[in-house]
Amino acid sequence: MDTPVDRDELFARMQYPLPHHLISRGVGKLAESRTPWLKDWAIRRFIRTFDVDMSQALESDPEAYACFNDFFTRALRADARPIGEGVVSPADGTLSQFGAIRQDTLVQAKGHTYSLNALLGGDAARAAPFREGSFATVYLSPRDYHRVHMPVTGTLREMVYVPGRLFSVNQATANHVPGLFARNERLVCLFDTEHGPLAMVLVGAMIVAAIETVWAGQVTPLSGRVQTTRFDEPIVIEKGQEMGRFKLGSTVVMCFGHDVAFRDVCTDGLVVNMGQSLAS
């Protein structure tokens, strides 16, 4: 008797041989196109396909955007996302996982874990402040607002680009690609905060053409090398202010030290808005 095919597993396995970066660069070029008919068609098709709510956008007219990426990274109205108390969600999305960091282990999906040390770029000293701390993973779906904000006020200490693959990020790959978030290309941003150390990890994914930060712009590191930038002059970003954005896709993993406790309302799969209170 034939064993039924697990479609999620098949979807994940099909991605291994794909030229992830080549595909992402190609999509990125299309997303930057300023050809009116092409960008207007792409934006309107995207809005229909993913049921994007434009009523909260600062610019609600799809044709007003110069290119698809400008639409995708659209700003919201100033009153669209009130900022709650304590530690807040850095983005709109789904709280896919949260909880304790057990020594070097974080939960990726039910029954699947990955390494804190690997996530942060393979430096044990960098990972040490977060051992036995806590973490939260927010997945941004295509229809979500794609700017990333500070969950608390923080002083930027270090930025680390970590090269990697660009598997798509969703429940199928979380369940079937071991160490997904520590395997994909990512940007690790380390902050000092009143709640202790904070690592904001912006994880790339298939067709994520670029990651930007407010202090460095688009991050374009040397290919294939871990690149570390330390900041001697303080860069302070207030709670609720933008710290970065995805030009298409992906996921934010927050790692904290020992002084953060999640609120009772938090559950795996909770849909959250940027600014929504998650922890104290």
Swiss-Prot record:
Keywords of this entry: Cell membrane, Decarboxylase, Lipid biosynthesis, Lipid metabolism, Lyase, Membrane, Phospholipid biosynthesis, Phospholipid metabolism, Pyruvate, Zymogen
GO biological process, alphabetically ordered: phosphatidylethanolamine biosynthetic process
Cofactor note text: Binds 1 pyruvoyl group covalently per subunit.
Associated pathway: Phospholipid metabolism; phosphatidylethanolamine biosynthesis; phosphatidylethanolamine from CDP-diacylglycerol: step 2/2
GO molecular function: phosphatidylserine decarboxylase activity
Cofactors: pyruvate
Sites marked Cleavage (non-hydrolytic): G249, S250
EC number: 4.1.1.65
Cellular component terms (Gene Ontology): plasma membrane
Membrane topology designation: Peripheral membrane protein
Subcellular location, record wording: Cell membrane
Domain of life: Bacteria
One of the Pfam families matching this protein, by short name: PS_Dcarbxylase
Pyruvic acid (Ser) modified-residue sites: S250
Catalytic activity: a 1,2-diacyl-sn-glycero-3-phospho-L-serine + H(+) = a 1,2-diacyl-sn-glycero-3-phosphoethanolamine + CO2
Post-translational modification: Is synthesized initially as an inactive proenzyme. Formation of the active enzyme involves a self-maturation process in which the active site pyruvoyl group is generated from an internal serine residue via an autocatalytic post-translational modification. Two non-identical subunits are generated from the proenzyme in this reaction, and the pyruvate is formed at the N-terminus of the alpha chain, which is derived from the carboxyl end of the proenzyme.
Positions annotated as active site in the UniProt record: D92 (charge relay system), H149 (charge relay system), S250 (charge relay system), S250 (schiff-base intermediate with substrate)
HAMAP family (UniProt xref): PS_decarb_PSD_B_type1 (MF_00662)
Role summary: Catalyzes the formation of phosphatidylethanolamine (PtdEtn) from phosphatidylserine (PtdSer).
Subunit structure: Heterodimer of a large membrane-associated beta subunit and a small pyruvoyl-containing alpha subunit.
Sequence similarity: Belongs to the phosphatidylserine decarboxylase family. PSD-B subfamily. Prokaryotic type I sub-subfamily.
NCBIfam families named in the record: PS_decarb
Name of the protein this chain belongs to: Phosphatidylserine decarboxylase proenzyme
Species annotation: Chromohalobacter salexigens (strain ATCC BAA-138 / DSM 3043 / CIP 106854 / NCIMB 13768 / 1H11)
Gene: psd
